[in-house]
Swiss-Prot record:
Entry GO CC: cytoplasm; nucleoplasm; nucleus
Protein name: Zinc finger protein ZIC 1
Described function: Acts as a transcriptional activator. Involved in neurogenesis. Plays important roles in the early stage of organogenesis of the CNS, as well as during dorsal spinal cord development and maturation of the cerebellum. Involved in the spatial distribution of mossy fiber (MF) neurons within the pontine gray nucleus (PGN). Plays a role in the regulation of MF axon pathway choice. Promotes MF migration towards ipsilaterally-located cerebellar territories. May have a role in shear flow mechanotransduction in osteocytes. Retains nuclear GLI1 and GLI3 in the cytoplasm.
Keywords: Activator, Cytoplasm, Developmental protein, Differentiation, DNA-binding, Metal-binding, Neurogenesis, Nucleus, Repeat, Transcription, Transcription regulation, Zinc, Zinc-finger
Pfam families: zf-C2H2 (PF00096), zf-C2H2_15 (PF23561), zf_ZIC (PF18366)
Underlying gene: Zic1
Gene Ontology molecular function terms on file: DNA-binding transcription activator activity, RNA polymerase II-specific; DNA-binding transcription factor activity; RNA polymerase II cis-regulatory region sequence-specific DNA binding; RNA polymerase II transcription regulatory region sequence-specific DNA binding; zinc ion binding
Residue ranges, compositional bias (Low complexity): 386-427
Effect of disrupting the coding gene: Mice show a cell mass decrease of the spinal dorsal horn, hypoplasia and abnormal foliation patterns in the cerebellum.
Tissue specificity annotation: Expressed in osteoblasts (at protein level). Expressed in the CNS. A high level expression is seen in the cerebellum, while a low level expression is seen in the olfactory bulb, diencephalon, and brainstem. Expressed in lumbar spine and iliac crest.
Amino acid sequence: MLLDAGPQYPAIGVTTFGASRHHSAGDVAERDVGLGINPFADGMGAFKLNPSSHELASAGQTAFTSQAPGYAAAAALGHHHHPGHVGSYSSAAFNSTRDFLFRNRGFGDAAAAASAQHSLFAASAGGFGGPHGHTDAAGHLLFSGLHEQAAGHASPNVVNGQMRLGFSGDMYPRPEQYGQVTSPRSEHYAAPQLHGYGPMNVNMAAHHGAGAFFRYMRQPIKQELICKWIEPEQLANPKKSCNKTFSTMHELVTHVTVEHVGGPEQSNHICFWEECPREGKPFKAKYKLVNHIRVHTGEKPFPCPFPGCGKVFARSENLKIHKRTHTGEKPFKCEFEGCDRRFANSSDRKKHMHVHTSDKPYLCKMCDKSYTHPSSLRKHMKVHESSSQGSQPSPAASSGYESSTPPTIVSPTTDNPTTSSMSPSSSAVHHTAGHSALSSNFNEWYV
């Protein structure tokens, strides 16, 4: 649908493009079919870049010359259709993007700038070419809720009048939004608002509310950190904790350090955090109490400095050990003569020393096996886990390890009178109880 721009924008010097014409829904749908599919748009709902050549010629415009028909733009306004010809952009239509922006910023003719903005940012009629007279454009939108304010203002002369990719007048507004037009749409903006908008701030100065698009964005998560410190004078039942809330970790840590831990005048370094497992056992130094409180607050102030790692630690000692995984440093050598193994931390070296001393301090609670290293015990516990999930009565029989105690194999035809006299129901209960004992949480022993 071609609109007469002259009567709408007399103040900004935009002359008329030509006689105003109205096209029926059938004509618009036929143009959709006639244009075919092009790389930039599926139909008439693409951006209208500029009027056709004879439209500009009839208006006597000299700022911009004609543009070749194509990209669902020129044929939308002309009377003659050329389905077989889809031209490229005319070199004279816009000499460059710079010239276009200069004109819009006031360096060129005001009428030319207004004409350019009217043609570039206006949405042509059309969309997915549906049935004739179909005006439910919101059904074809990615965010249909963005057009809910204009969903009820459909024009009988417009097919799929909403712009397919637009945000209800945010960046590519319809021309009807800036003045009274032939379409009976009641839009959000009046004609005087047209004078002050630039090429990139359309609908930014007078935005309605926070913007319809922002309701689809994730709301910021409000983090509440609660202080669970119990003052010594409030230890009597019922215990009452501090319960002050903070939005950042820094605020919580500062509060606990200043208000509860205290300064050097404090001689007793005791953690009074709610449900602390130390149960009032004091620390020998204040820095140890501060480090311990990070277990409750979750503070980890020591990030790994190596790019791409992203790990953070609550203790500087743990960060120092971790950085050796990046540098490859292994300062702890095995003290056993003839062994050249080196380790990044002393605890790994201590675990390794059990190999030489034949000590096996890591015992399995399900059987009599013991191991020199906790990793070996963890592998062994997986055998018990798999056997407890299966139907084998004895995990040691399928463990794959040689055990010092041979497994006891219970035959179905055993001579044990107690076993043979069990009823099916009682044997089922016995079988279930045995599996429940084996299906304990094995990870709680060794991590």
